[in-house]
């Protein structure tokens, strides 16, 4: 059953044309209008229904001015005046969805299969899924820090939140002083967002608008658009197109948070991952499975498994070259730019070995008037619910250090709200070539919560000797019990002491990383923000870290390790008790650190 939207403070004027004379009647008292789908009803203070009708495609009705609506039924017309333009806008969007002819399709409907859209909005209508995203402290904390630190971009401004979900970003905008926030949400989560707005006494500043941003209207243009439209590999789910579509509501010189997105890709070697996929496909190689020969399907099984992008994290030592960056400037990009994304690459190989595929991650930047804040999903940063994505080649390519690996990654948008990926790679010196076709809609979620293993041959001294020579964290005195017999002990006291470094885990999984704090002025170094540019970057810097804690529904807060951010906003301090946007947030791009940027704790 559709949700009921309630609009208080409504006035009613009825106009009749009986016997050739114009007759008018106005309700002197304010009424309450309730709308469910196409059914509207007006009630007085005694809860008596004074008017009721159903709006369909054939109903004669129209907008009048900024906050009124007229319905004609037979010889009588009814004019409904709403208390505010925002109330009228919310009501009008409900009515539009009921009156839209079947032949009229929005931009979203044109690019999306109905079955995919139903599944998509059902998924995001669950509170548990919103919780998963909200508990990603890197994601949520970075958004809050970016908005609060750039409070001048929000104070007394009108903001549009695209795909607001629970409304958390809208609340951040209000915390930064926004005058009005229009929170648009197409899933049933809009009902929960509206309840949160009411329970937080913000109905005068936050207006929840149920519907797709491609199909709704706003009573005014906005100064700022905020959203969290990123999917795996940045582009999955195709919500970035809805984010760009929302620019039709943006004032000239308005801003968008996030402002730019960088996709990074680099070649990797991982024999274990490659063999895992082959091993799974080998199930179909059996000549007598319960008396049935399955081997005819083995080739199809290999193709299917290798079409799956791998979602997990990894040790950065599997990367064999510096990453290439592809930048999208959301302020300049058009929706059609994301229908076909071509990323050329040329890697100067730093190591010899087999290239099994390409690894992908992304960073987004919030470029505000006061500072630029980066949200990174790089393998050196705290793990997020985006993880990293790896795309295998069906046939590995052998390269030597100094070789050039060149080729193209092509992403073609499909109606499943995702992309078909084509990868072609070639070693220029030898002519060795490999390729693969992948389906980003059907990834394999491989992450287990354990520390990623380093590649074989990563130790250049004896790990066993290092284990016993770690700074006196363990002595035979503490390890001996009664009678001089060794007692049971935890090896973490040997290899995980406060002064030691665990060489088996180079990825900080739960612990906030060192804070990157640029000197004043608080802007990152100017960069080329042209859509569709790809550039080489330095290989990601690594900070050693002990392993933190992970849980399936989000990232458990880790210890700050004594590191503290010294540049928290004096206007809107963020409580670091929950590590939300505290030490975890880098104020400079983690993938492109300028020479005058200070790194604490590295």
Swiss-Prot record:
EC number(s) reported in the record: 2.1.1.319
Q: Provide the assembly information.
A: Homodimer.
Protein family according to the UniProt entry: Belongs to the class I-like SAM-binding methyltransferase superfamily. Protein arginine N-methyltransferase family.
Function per UniProt: Methylates (mono- and asymmetric dimethylation) the guanidino nitrogens of arginyl residues in several proteins involved in DNA packaging, transcription regulation, pre-mRNA splicing, and mRNA stability. Recruited to promoters upon gene activation together with histone acetyltransferases from EP300/P300 and p160 families, methylates histone H3 at 'Arg-17' (H3R17me) and activates transcription via chromatin remodeling.
Tell me where on the tree of life, at the top rank, the source sits. Answer: Eukaryota
Residues the record lists as binding S-adenosyl-L-methionine? 130, 139, 163, 185, 214, 242
The record places domain SAM-dependent MTase PRMT-type at: 117-424
Where in the cell does this protein reside?
Nucleus; Cytoplasm; Chromosome
Keywords on record: Chromatin regulator, Chromosome, Cytoplasm, Methyltransferase, Nucleus, S-adenosyl-L-methionine, Transcription, Transcription regulation, Transferase
- Record the organism: Xenopus laevis
Q: Which residues cross the membrane?
A: none
What are its GO biological-process terms?
chromatin remodeling; methylation; regulation of DNA-templated transcription; regulation of intracellular estrogen receptor signaling pathway; replication fork reversal
Report the GO molecular function annotations: histone H3R17 methyltransferase activity; histone H3R2 methyltransferase activity; histone H3R26 methyltransferase activity; histone methyltransferase activity; protein-arginine N-methyltransferase activity; protein-arginine omega-N asymmetric methyltransferase activity; transcription cis-regulatory region binding; transcription coactivator activity
Reactions the enzyme catalyzes:
L-arginyl-[protein] + 2 S-adenosyl-L-methionine = N(omega),N(omega)-dimethyl-L-arginyl-[protein] + 2 S-adenosyl-L-homocysteine + 2 H(+)
* Cited InterPro entries: Arg_MeTrfase (IPR025799), Histone-Arg_MeTrfase_N (IPR020989), PH-like_dom_sf (IPR011993), PRMT_dom (IPR055135), SAM-dependent_MTases_sf (IPR029063)
What is the organism lineage in this UniProt record? Eukaryota, Metazoa, Chordata, Craniata, Vertebrata
Which Pfam family is one of those matched by this entry?
A: PrmA
Q: What is this protein called?
A: Histone-arginine methyltransferase CARM1
A GO cellular component entry from the record: nuclear replication fork
Q: Which gene encodes it?
A: carm1
> Which region ranges are annotated with the description Transactivation domain?
470-602
């Amino acid at each position: 059953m559709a949700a009921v939207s309630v609009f208080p403070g409504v006035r009613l004027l009825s106009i009749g044309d009986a016997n050739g004379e114009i007759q008018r009647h106005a309700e002197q008292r304010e009424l309450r209008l309730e709308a469910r789908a196409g059914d509207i009803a007006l009630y007085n203070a005694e809860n008596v229904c004074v008017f009721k009708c159903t709006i369909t495609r054939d109903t004669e009705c129209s907008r009048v001015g900024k906050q009124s609506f007229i319905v004609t039924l037979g010889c009588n017309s009814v004019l409904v005046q709403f208390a505010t333009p925002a109330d009228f806008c919310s009501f009008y969007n409900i009515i539009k969805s009921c009156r839209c002819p079947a032949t009229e399709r929005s931009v979203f409907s044109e690019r999306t299969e109905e079955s995919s859209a139903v599944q998509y909005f059902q998924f995001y209508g669950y509170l548990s899924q919103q919780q998963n995203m909200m508990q990603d402290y890197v994601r949520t904390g970075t958004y809050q820090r970016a908005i609060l630190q750039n409070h001048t971009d929000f104070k007394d401004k009108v903001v549009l939140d695209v795909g607001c979900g629970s409304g958390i970003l809208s609340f951040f905008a209000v915390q930064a002083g926004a005058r009005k926030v229009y929170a648009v949400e197409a899933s049933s989560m809009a009902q929960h967002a509206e309840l949160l707005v009411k329970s937080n006494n913000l109905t005068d500043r936050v207006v929840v608008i149920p519907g797709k941003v491609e199909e709704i209207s706003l009573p005014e243009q906005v100064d700022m658009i905020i959203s969290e439209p990123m999917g795996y590999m940045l582009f999955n789910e195709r919500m970035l197109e809805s984010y760009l579509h929302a620019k039709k509501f943006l004032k000239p010189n308005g801003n968008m948070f996030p402002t730019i997105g960088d996709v990074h890709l680099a070649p990797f070697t991982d024999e274990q991952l490659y063999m895992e996929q082959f091993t799974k496909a080998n199930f179909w190689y059996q000549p007598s499975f319960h008396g049935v020969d399955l081997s005819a399907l083995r080739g199809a099984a290999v193709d299917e498994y290798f079409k799956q992008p791998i979602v997990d994290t990894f040790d950065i030592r599997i990367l064999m070259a510096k990453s290439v960056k592809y930048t999208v400037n959301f302020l300049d990009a058009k929706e059609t730019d994301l229908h076909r994304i071509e990323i050329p690459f040329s890697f100067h190989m730093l190591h010899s070995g087999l290239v099994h595929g390409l690894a992908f991650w992304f960073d987004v930047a919030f470029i505000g008037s006061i500072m630029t804040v980066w949200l990174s999903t790089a393998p050196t940063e705290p793990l997020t619910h985006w993880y990293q994505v790896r795309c295998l080649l069906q046939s590995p390519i052998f390269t030597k250090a100094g070789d050039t690996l060149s080729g193209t990654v092509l992403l073609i948008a499909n109606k499943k709200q995702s992309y078909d990926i084509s990868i072609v790679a070639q070693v220029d010196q030898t002519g060795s070539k490999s390729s693969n076709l992948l389906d980003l809609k059907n990834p394999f979620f491989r992450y287990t919560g354990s520390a990623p293993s380093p590649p074989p041959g990563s130790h250049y001294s004896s790990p066993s000797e290092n284990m016993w020579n770690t700074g006196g964290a363990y002595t035979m005195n503490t390890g001996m019990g009664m009678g001089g017999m060794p007692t049971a002990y935890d090896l973490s006291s040997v290899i995980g002491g406060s002064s030691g470094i665990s060489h088996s885990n180079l990825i900080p999984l739960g612990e906030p990383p060192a804070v990157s704090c640029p000197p004043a002025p608080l802007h990152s170094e100017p960069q080329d923000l042209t859509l569709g540019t790809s550039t080489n970057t330095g290989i990601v810097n690594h900070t050693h870290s002990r392993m933190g804690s992970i849980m399936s529904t989000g990232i458990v807060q880790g210890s700050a390790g004594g590191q503290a951010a010294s540049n928290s906003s004096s206007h809107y301090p963020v409580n670091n008790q929950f590590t939300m946007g505290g030490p975890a947030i880098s104020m400079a791009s983690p993938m492109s650190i300028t020479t005058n940027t200070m790194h604490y704790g590295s």
